[in-house]
Amino acid sequence: PLYSSAASDVYKRQKEVKPYREEDRVAEDSNTPTFVSGKLTIDNFRWAGVPFYIRTGKRMKSKTIQVVVEFKEVPMNLYYETDKLLDSNLLVINIQPNEGVSLHLNAKKNIQGIDTEPVQLSYAMSAQDKMNTVDAYENLLFDCLKGDATNFTHWEELKSTWKFVDAIQDEWTMVEPCFPNYESGTNGPLESDLLLSRDGNHWWDDIH
């Protein structure tokens, strides 16, 4: 069922930060989620068996937008004697606040033997590039003036999105809400970590 592949919570007090239910214009018994994480799958030939994990919330450890692609391990590794020391191969796409791309790989050390070490190939926009780059809404406003709808959401896309979200919301209304809560300034509740650990995976926190 859908609700077994998602976690929804409310942040609580930490230090001087108010918990959500003590914020202005928020009901004391509010069950409005401030955090959600989930596991998504796509049932087609291209993405069959590939899990997509998503996570978003208020008052988390950092305000970032990031995509991490973890490549599958090969059945037979050339460095089989030291494969337990190999790091995961990752493609990290940083969207906000700092745009950039990095590729995390394992490379053979420049010594005798087959020992490896992690290496990182990175690209990040320079300060000058950032100064000369228009903001996202500038492009959209300019497109609007030109009558170009390429970068705007189409109604059919929006309709499909709500169809997907409504299906999850309907499942949650069928079971009694459970709000284990999480501390503000963290990456969410334990239940979010368990969602991945059941598959032998984990969130890639603090990676760039």
Predicted regions located by residue number:
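Flexible, glycine/threonine-enriched loop-and-boundary segments that flank and lead into catalytic domains
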Residues: 17-28, 51-54
